[in-house]
Amino acid sequence: MAKINLTPKKIYEQEFKTSIRGYDKTEVDEFLDDVIKDYTVYIALVKELQEENAKLKAKATSAPASRPAYASATSEPSHATTNIASASNYDILKRISRLEKEVFGKQIVE
C-alpha cells in the first residue's frame, strides 16, 4: 500500500521559491486551501473505510461458527418438497397422456 507523504499541515506550511516572474502568491494560496480541504476529506474517508473494514473482518471471523447450521438445513431438501414435486410430475404426465390420446386417437380414427 502506498504511503501518504503529505498532511494538511505540511501542505499549509509549504513555502515556494519566488522569482522575478513567479506565480501569484494569492492564487497559489487559494489552490493550496482547496487541496487541504480535499485532503482532509480523504483522510476522514480513509478512517471511515478502515473502521468499516475492521467491522466486516470481525463479522467474517465470527460467521463460520453459525454457517454450518444454515448449510446443513439447506443442503437436504425436505420430504414434503420431494413429495410435492413428484405429485406435480405425476399430474403433468397424466395430462400429457390424456392430450396425446385426444390428438393421436382422433388421427387414427380419421
Swiss-Prot record:
Chain intervals with Low complexity compositional bias: 60-75
Chain spans, region Disordered: 59-79
Coiled-coil region list: 37-63
Keywords: Cell cycle, Cell division, Cell shape, Coiled coil, Cytoplasm
GO terms for biological process, alphabetical: cell division; regulation of cell shape
Pfam annotation, one family: DivIVA
Keyword flag Cell wall biogenesis/degradation: no
GO cellular component: cytoplasm
Subunit and interaction comment: Forms polymers through the coiled coil domains. Interacts with PBP1, MreC and EzrA.
Record's function text: Divisome component that associates with the complex late in its assembly, after the Z-ring is formed, and is dependent on DivIC and PBP2B for its recruitment to the divisome. Together with EzrA, is a key component of the system that regulates PBP1 localization during cell cycle progression. Its main role could be the removal of PBP1 from the cell pole after pole maturation is completed. Also contributes to the recruitment of PBP1 to the division complex. Not essential for septum formation.
Name of the molecule in the record: Cell cycle protein GpsB
The organism of origin for this protein: Streptococcus thermophilus (strain ATCC BAA-250 / LMG 18311)
Lineage: Bacteria, Bacillati, Bacillota, Bacilli, Lactobacillales
